[in-house]
Amino acid sequence: MQQQYPFRDIEQQAQQYWESNATFTATEVSDKPKYYCLSMFPYPSGKLHMGHVRNYTIGDVLSRFHRMRGYNVMQPMGWDAFGLPAENAAIKHNVAPAGWTYSNIEHMKGQLKSLGLAVDWQREIATCKPDYYRWEQWLFTELYKKGLIYKKTATVNWDPVDQTVLANEQVIDGRGWRSGALVEKRDIPQYFMKITAYAEELLADLDKLDGWPEQVKTMQRNWIGKSYGCEVEFPLAVGNGTLKVYTTRPDTLMGATYVAIAAEHALATQAAKDNPALQAFIEECKRGSVAEADLATAEKKGMNSGLFVLHPITGEKLPVWVANYVLISYGEGAVMAVPAHDERDFEFASKYKLPIKAVIKPAHGELELPLQAAYTEHGILFDSGDFNGLDFSQASDAIAAALAAKNLGKRRTQYRLRDWGISRQRYWGCPIPIVHCPSCGEVPVPAEQLPVVLPEDVVMDGVGSPIKKDPAFYETTCPSCGEKATRETDTMDTFVESSWYFARYASFDAHSSMVDERANYWLPVDQYIGGIEHAILHLLYARFFNKLMRDVGLVRHDEPFTKLLTQGMVLKDGSKMSKSKGNTVDPQELIDNYGADTARLFMMFAAPPEQSLEWSDAGVEGAHRFLKRVWTAVANHVESGIVAAFTMGDLSAELKAFRRQLHQTIEKVTDDYGRRHAFNTAIAAVMELMNAYAKIEGHDATTRAIRQEALENIILLLSPIVPHICHALWQALRPGTQLLDTRWPVANKAAMVQDEIELVLQVNGKLRGSMTVSRTLDKAAIEALAVQQECIQKYLAEGSVRKIIVVPNKLVNIVVG
């Protein structure tokens, strides 16, 4: 065995061995408990980045650890391959998006393999391939028939740079999540998935997810946004009809002084017909930001519509204002404005000199009038007629009952969650399987005619989608009547593909169904790993899709992911690595210069997985040095002759202490990998053990047996993190055996018991020394031994021993007087 650490050779050999032996091929035929470990699949951008390396190493460590613990492990990999960057790259490089994507997949697959991931590559999927998206189209048609997908003209978030519609979740602080452009509002016919039909279950089932970070569950709860309130109808002052609002504070109704409506509200459109100034204001609002966070902080603007409504209880005339702080998508697109008890209403009323009427005061004390700010706490009603003196709960009930008696309101539970608009005006996505027929209207494509294949040989000119200009794609016949018809040319939001891929891995080669019975063996995913930035978007959609698949009879479980680990970002110079900042490090260079094991070790040692990791060249050097130390330690031991069978004689105190540390390390590392996912402290414990190993002296049979035991266990403990070097070193230590067929070590409890303990010695409570004694020594023997110690003898001359106090396993206090 050579003394130098030949990382390139051993990594190539290990990877070839795993591939030729199909080591990581998963099967459902097993008597072992299953463990499905999944890291969020990558977008094939062309190159791995350090975030990928970290994400996939975490998953790989857990997969390898569980395999050695006796689990039947599946760790698959695939490609989230549709999406806008492929179109942009195609325009830039004058290639078709498909060719660019497939070329990137091949390159990145090679990079992932060079990391030594324990992946079952036979399960590889690419979401842009027809054999994948045909099932997405099939599910679309099933949901369409059930009414869970519908089409309506809606005010949508329009990204003027990417030229497409964005879901609410894809608008971050008023800007497109990918382009960063300020989002506009437009009215466009869209297909929607009825995620609101599952709002209550999506909310309630969060309580089942004990293995998820609380932060992610809180973000989803807030996004779903369940609230209890009241639907209130304000009769129009002129003509028939009412203006509906939703409020969570019915107790404040008596303080309403105007009603505010969104720019897109039907009443606003009606009022603007003869009012050019109002029409111009409405257009200005539509161009504004649509993010709730922006609405909260933006300057409040409004215009009187000239319309009036009647207060449902007092009959008082209230003006209707068009306001930029009202969302058409929440409640009814209208709010009853109570300036005295709502901050936004107060700000708006103050600006436009509208009445501010206080009707709630603190339960104890008075309200200082005139108000300098809105009083938003719950309290007691006053100046509210029959409702005076009631608290929040009593007033809410009484006012709801009064409205119901007049047929002008009722109790209502409301969700902030909106239905998911999935239509995209882009080319590189899954075609929506709908045919538009002049006679039959919208007709879903029958299952036997699926997939509707996206043509891949296209020319991107940067203006719109090529399939919208391609008669060969959109000209067709109606599946229902056979007449000439046209295909839908919008494609689906790419978040649809990633909402069910976890199930397809389990039935990767199913030809007659979306998933088959194998999915019920593997699902739910035992451990899911990905960034916290997916907390709402992807993770909510995947939970929704799992329930959709359950309800069409494809899977049995309610939730897709049992445990979730959200890994932190990789930083350099304090900020996230990015091309624009020029602070990236190419993983390929790292692997070429130091090896995949060094890259993996650094990534796992530099920080706990949930925290951000700061890149450090010195840290990489340190990781490489440590692997060299391990290699050299094994090489030296092998050179002196490996120990085939342990024959341990009586151990010296030094060897006992070392063996105790060895088995304590096994126990700690097992807990760190399995329960805590604290890979950094596991590595630190093995490093400490290596330091102790270096201090062992002697070459007798017992010492060499201890060395062999230590090195074997060190290799096993490190193998999930640095599998290549461990594969090679195990063969050197145990010729003819394979590391991956070896079970995970179990700590020897007997070896961890400390035979001897150190007791502190005190005289009259003051520290005077210490002594080492057998753990089994009784109290009388300890007392006798204590007074014989040299450090105690001189104090006994000062008087007689009056009392000896022994605190078991800690100290002996001799009272002299």
UniProtKB/Swiss-Prot annotation:
InterPro entries tied to this protein: aa-tRNA-synth_I_CS, aa-tRNA-synth_Ia, Leu-tRNA-ligase, Leu_tRNA-synth_edit, M/V/L/I-tRNA-synth_anticd-bd, Methionyl/Leucyl_tRNA_Synth, Rossmann-like_a/b/a_fold, tRNAsynth_Ia_anticodon-bd
EC number from the UniProt entry: 6.1.1.4
Annotated positions binding ATP: 579
Reaction catalysed by this enzyme: tRNA(Leu) + L-leucine + ATP = L-leucyl-tRNA(Leu) + AMP + diphosphate
Motif ('KMSKS' region): 576-580
Record's subcellular location: Cytoplasm
Pfam families assigned: Anticodon_1, tRNA-synt_1, tRNA-synt_1_2, tRNA-synt_1g
UniProt motif 'HIGH' region: location: 42-52
CDD domains referenced in this protein's UniProt entry, alphabetically: Anticodon_Ia_Leu_BEm, LeuRS_core
Listed GO MF terms: aminoacyl-tRNA deacylase activity; ATP binding; leucine-tRNA ligase activity
Keyword annotations: Aminoacyl-tRNA synthetase, ATP-binding, Cytoplasm, Ligase, Nucleotide-binding, Protein biosynthesis
Domain of life: Bacteria
HAMAP family, per the entry: Leu_tRNA_synth_B
Family: Belongs to the class-I aminoacyl-tRNA synthetase family.
Protein name: Leucine--tRNA ligase
Gene name tied to this protein: leuS
